[in-house]
């Protein structure tokens, strides 16, 4: 088994010459390699809809973890209900932070997402994912290379130093148009906020729509000199 400790660059290769640009091959390898010791961390953005559809073809009972920060858009929670109906066999786990919003406010002050967004992300996203990955050998992410400068060197199989795990990224070669083409082709549900200027959807407190020509991450933590929550730093 390929692990964080035994990982070597280019230790596994995949053909990109298929309709899914290698994604199905990567997922088939991942579930064969890690069996039930791999989880997909899904934010339920549009890339997530593609991955859920592909994962359902490879492993219909796969584990999917959603980091429920308690401050997501209502549209996101409604989408999760639709996904459960569409893919009833998937094991979708809604992971909660240890602190409620009230407890967080008492310890760190009101509106921590404004005063210290890095700490807020750590409490409500990073620590819960750490706990979710503790019993896993690998995890799956929907990162695409064209999303941002920080993601353009992502590989199919990555040594994730942040979580000391293997991170599997099947969609690295997909473009924004290809993601949407797949969603429409398979009539997949998606967050309606995508239709009103939100290419990347996170917590309601820290996500704004993006103007024409903007980077897909521009609406995240606008004005905070921050475009990543910390889950994907290497």
Curated annotation (Swiss-Prot):
> For [4Fe-4S] cluster, which residues are the binding ones?
120-121, 203, 206
Enzyme's top EC category:
oxidoreductase
The cross-references to Pfam families, in alphabetical order and at most eight, read: PAPS_reduct
Species assigned in the record = Bacillus mycoides (strain KBAB4)
The cross-references to InterPro entries, in alphabetical order and at most eight, read: APS_reductase (IPR011798), PAPS/APS_Rdtase (IPR004511), PAPS_reduct_dom (IPR002500), Rossmann-like_a/b/a_fold (IPR014729)
Cofactor binding note from Swiss-Prot or TrEMBL: Binds 1 [4Fe-4S] cluster per subunit.
The identity of this protein, by name, is: Adenosine 5'-phosphosulfate reductase
Q: Which keywords does the record carry? A: Cytoplasm, Iron, Iron-sulfur, Metal-binding, Oxidoreductase
- What is one Gene Ontology biological process annotated in the Swiss-Prot or TrEMBL record? cysteine biosynthetic process
Function noted in UniProt: Catalyzes the formation of sulfite from adenosine 5'-phosphosulfate (APS) using thioredoxin as an electron donor.
Q: Which residues form the active site?
A: 229 (nucleophile)
């Amino acid at each position: 088994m390929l692990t964080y400790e035994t990982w070597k660059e280019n230790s596994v290769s995949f053909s990109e010459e298929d309709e899914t640009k290698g994604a199905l091959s990567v997922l088939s390898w991942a579930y064969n390699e890690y069996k039930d010791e791999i989880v997909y961390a899904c934010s339920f953005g549009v890339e997530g809809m593609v991955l859920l559809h592909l994962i359902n073809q490879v492993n219909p009972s796969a584990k999917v973890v959603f980091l429920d920060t308690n401050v997501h858009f209502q549209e996101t929670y409604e989408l999760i209900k639709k996904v459960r109906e569409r893919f009833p066999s998937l094991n979708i786990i809604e992971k909660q932070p240890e602190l409620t919003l009230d407890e967080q406010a008492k310890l760190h002050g009101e509106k921590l997402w404004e005063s210290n967004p890095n700490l807020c992300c750590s409490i409500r996203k990073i620590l819960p994912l750490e706990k979710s990955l503790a019993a896993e050998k690998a995890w799956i992410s929907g990162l695409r290379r064209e999303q941002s400068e920080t993601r353009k060197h992502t590989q199919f199989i990555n040594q994730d130093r942040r979580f000391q795990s293997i991170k599997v990224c099947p969609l690295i070669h997909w473009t924004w148009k290809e993601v949407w083409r797949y969603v429409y082709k398979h009539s997949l549900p998606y967050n309606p906020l995508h239709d009103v200027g939100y290419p990347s959807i996170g917590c309601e407190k820290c996500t704004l729509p993006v103007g024409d020509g903007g980077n897909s991450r521009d609406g995240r933590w606008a004005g905070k000199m921050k475009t990543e929550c910390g889950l994907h730093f290497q």
